């Protein structure tokens, strides 16, 4: 059975291991071989004053994580998920749906009105988020410029 809870500094070794195992594999193929760079990245996300991160556990094993932050905006309080993943061998087995529903309940109880996230439109996660009730923001685009 799954349980979820807010992550703490004591979970960072497991967070790092899970993050690498998911995002260095299909479909992402991100190169997180630089442990210092990964430590800095995760530290930036989890070290913010408004950081709010959750873990999904099966027994005592971390199998899912959501790293995000609460943002206060004119239209209400938001939770921006920066990173969300489920251990590869648990994907497609309702773990992600269970976890996201738990997160929704938790952040709603904290006054959050909207959850935001981004993903590629060419990966399975896109369909998962749509199934979970997320909609594309039609009037917003994501810009990038390599310098």
Segments and roles (model prediction):
Residues 2-17:
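A short beta-loop-alpha structural element at the N-terminal edge
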Residues 86, 92-105, 131:
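Conserved acetyl-CoA-binding loop-helix of GNAT-fold acetyltransferases
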Residues 116-126, 144-147:
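Conserved beta-strand-loop-alpha-helix junction that forms the acyl-donor binding cleft
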Residues 100, 107-120:
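Conserved GNAT acetyl-CoA-binding A-motif
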Residues 71-81, 91, 137-139:
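A conserved beta-turn-beta hairpin within the catalytic core of GNAT-like acetyltransferases
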Residues 55, 61-70, 80, 85:
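Conserved beta-strand in the GNAT
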Residues 20-42:
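Conserved GNAT-fold acetyl-CoA-binding loop/helix
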Residues 43-55:
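A short helix-loop-beta-strand connector motif used in the catalytic cores of GNAT acetyltransferases and
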């Amino acid at each position: 059975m799954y349980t979820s809870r807010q992550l703490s500094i004591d979970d960072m070794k497991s967070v790092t291991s899970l993050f690498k195992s998911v995002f260095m594999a299909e479909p992402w193929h991100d190169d997180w071989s630089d442990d210092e760079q990964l430590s800095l990245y995760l530290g930036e996300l989890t070290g913010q004053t408004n950081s709010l991160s959750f873990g999904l556990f099966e027994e005592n094993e971390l199998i899912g994580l959501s790293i995000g932050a609460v943002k206060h905006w004119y239209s209400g309080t938001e939770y921006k998920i920066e990173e969300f993943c489920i251990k590869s061998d648990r994907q497609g087995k309702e773990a992600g749906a269970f976890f996201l529903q738990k997160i929704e309940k938790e952040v709603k109880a904290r006054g959050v009105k909207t959850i935001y996230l981004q993903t590629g439109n060419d990966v399975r996660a896109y369909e998962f988020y749509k199934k979970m009730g997320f909609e594309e923001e039609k009037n917003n685009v994501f810009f990038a410029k390599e310098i």
